[in-house]
């Protein structure tokens, strides 16, 4: 599946938000790239809406065509379209692996899932965009548990704080999805209503 593989820090600076988490380069230079990066530019309503969409896309590693599908599904569901959109993105398997502390970044989580290191309810899943459901059980495949990365992650899980809607069992590298997240439980700096306004035009 196509995905953005370019420099994430540059995108973080352009959108003025840390898309990776703990990006030291962004912390040092949180202004847009380029010689005039520090100058304050008057932003139009459209530009603000576009920036929020780009922020969501790059945070979750989703390209435009797939993002439109997420929006269409969010719009069909009952409730607030913006909330639905963020919850759908947050429910991706690669994001759940990241939130559970089994990857340092969403990009790394996407790679681990793509390489077939996880099962969902006992079945191998190598699609990062796979949507988890309430009561799903996600495991690291037995033959993958001896990998150095998972051994190190297992030790770090003791001190890892995971979202309330997830539970991680460090001894078995198991992730339990107790429920799908509510918007208030998702700590990303995103104004999703601006995305709704953009697509509603």
From Swiss-Prot:
Matching InterPro entries: Ribosomal_uS4, Ribosomal_uS4_bac-type, Ribosomal_uS4_CS, Ribosomal_uS4_N, S4_RNA-bd, S4_RNA-bd_sf
SUPFAM superfamilies in UniProt: Alpha-L RNA-binding motif
GO biological process: ribosomal small subunit biogenesis; translation
Protein purpose: One of the primary rRNA binding proteins, it binds directly to 16S rRNA where it nucleates assembly of the body of the 30S subunit. With S5 and S12 plays an important role in translational accuracy.
Ranges for domain S4 RNA-binding: 91-151
Signal peptide: none
Disulphide-bonded residues: none
UniProt-recorded Gene Ontology molecular function terms: rRNA binding; structural constituent of ribosome
Gene symbol of the encoding locus: rpsD
GO cellular component: small ribosomal subunit
Keywords in alphabetical order: Ribonucleoprotein, Ribosomal protein, RNA-binding, rRNA-binding
Recorded family membership: Belongs to the universal ribosomal protein uS4 family.
Name of this chain's protein: Small ribosomal subunit protein uS4
Quaternary context: Part of the 30S ribosomal subunit. Contacts protein S5. The interaction surface between S4 and S5 is involved in control of translational fidelity.
Origin: domain of life: Bacteria
């Amino acid at each position: 599946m196509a995905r953005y593989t370019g420099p994430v820090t540059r995108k973080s600076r352009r959108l003025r938000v840390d898309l990776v988490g703990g990006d030291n380069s962004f912390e040092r230079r949180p202004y847009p790239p380029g010689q005039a990066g520090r100058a304050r530019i008057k932003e139009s309503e459209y530009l603000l809406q576009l920036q929020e969409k780009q922020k969501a896309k790059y945070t979750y590693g989703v390209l435009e065509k797939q993002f439109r599908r997420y929006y269409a599904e969010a719009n069909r569901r009952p409730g607030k379209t913006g909330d639905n959109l963020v919850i759908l993105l947050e429910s991706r398997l690669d994001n759940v692996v990241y939130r559970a502390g089994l990857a340092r970044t969403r990009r790394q989580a996407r790679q681990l899932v793509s390489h077939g290191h996880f099962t969902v309810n006992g079945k191998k899943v190598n699609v990062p965009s796979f949507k988890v459901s309430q009561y799903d059980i996600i495991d690291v495949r037995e033959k993958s548990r001896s990998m150095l990365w998972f051994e190190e992650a297992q030790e770090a899980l003791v001190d890892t704080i995971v979202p309330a809607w997830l539970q991680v069992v460090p001894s078995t590298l198991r992730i339990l999805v107790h429920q799908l997240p509510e918007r208030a439980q998702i700590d990303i700096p995103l104004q999703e209503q601006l995305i709704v306004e953009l697509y509603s035009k």
